[in-house]
A protein has these predicted regions:
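Histidine-centered phosphotransfer motif of kinases
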Residues: 1, 54-78
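DHp/HisKA dimerization-phosphotransfer hairpin of two-component histidine kinases
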Residues: 1-43, 85
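Conserved short strand/loop->alpha-helix "switch" segment adjacent to the catalytic nucleotide/phosphoryl-transfer site
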Residues: 40-65, 106
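Short beta-strand/loop element within the Bergerat-fold HATPase_c
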Residues: 79-89
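Conserved DxG motif in ATP/Mg2+-binding regions
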Residues: 91-99
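ATP phosphate-binding glycine-rich loop and adjacent ATP-lid/helix-beta elements
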Residues: 104-132
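Short C-terminal beta-strand
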Residues: 134-144
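C-terminal end segment of the histidine kinase catalytic
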Residues: 143-153
Length: 153
């Protein structure tokens, strides 16, 4: 039945998101996140030069998992597009999908809220758009020390 199918999808999404929280310990977080997304039936297409710094990759990986889960759950999508842009002082990451356009403004639930907290604790910024289509934008500082400067005061 439809209810059973939706329950299975939620169970898969929760499992993928739980395992994505363990990604930071993985040797290659972006590849691990890509595999988690594929388990949900979402292909991840990356464009641009992915950051080399492991701590930045470990911050991006949960965003990929969260966006893949939301792509399936809310947009009935099958592809997640990840665009990397290296700037002198930061790495920008834009995530969009091929799913349905959100019907209303996106309200951050548990997954996006937790992601925002992780990004901001690292000194980064996160923006979410619902129009003209879903887009998650991350801006992560190039220097890890810059993310923790305010802690020293």
């Amino acid at each position: 039945t439809e209810i059973r199918a939706n329950a299975v999808l939620w169970e898969q999404s929760i499992s993928v998101l739980y395992r994505s929280s363990q990604i930071a310990a993985q040797s290659e977080p972006l590849e691990t996140a890509k595999k988690r997304a594929e388990e949900l039936g979402v292909s991840v297409l990356m464009t641009g030069n992915a950051p080399q710094r492991q701590w930045i990759r470990a911050l991006i990986a949960p965003a990929i998992c969260e966006c893949a889960a939301n792509c399936v759950r809310h947009a009935d999508g099958t592809e997640l597009y990840v665009f990397f842009l290296q700037k002198p002082d930061c790495t920008e990451v834009s995530l969009t999908n091929n799913g349905a356009v959100p019907k209303e403004k996106i309200t951050e639930g548990g997954g996006l809220s937790m992601l925002r907290q992780r990004i901001e604790e690292a000194g980064g910024k996160m923006e979410v758009w619902s129009s003209p289509r879903f887009k998650l934008m991350l801006s992560l500082p190039e220097q890890e020390e810059a993310a923790h400067e305010s802690d020293d005061r």
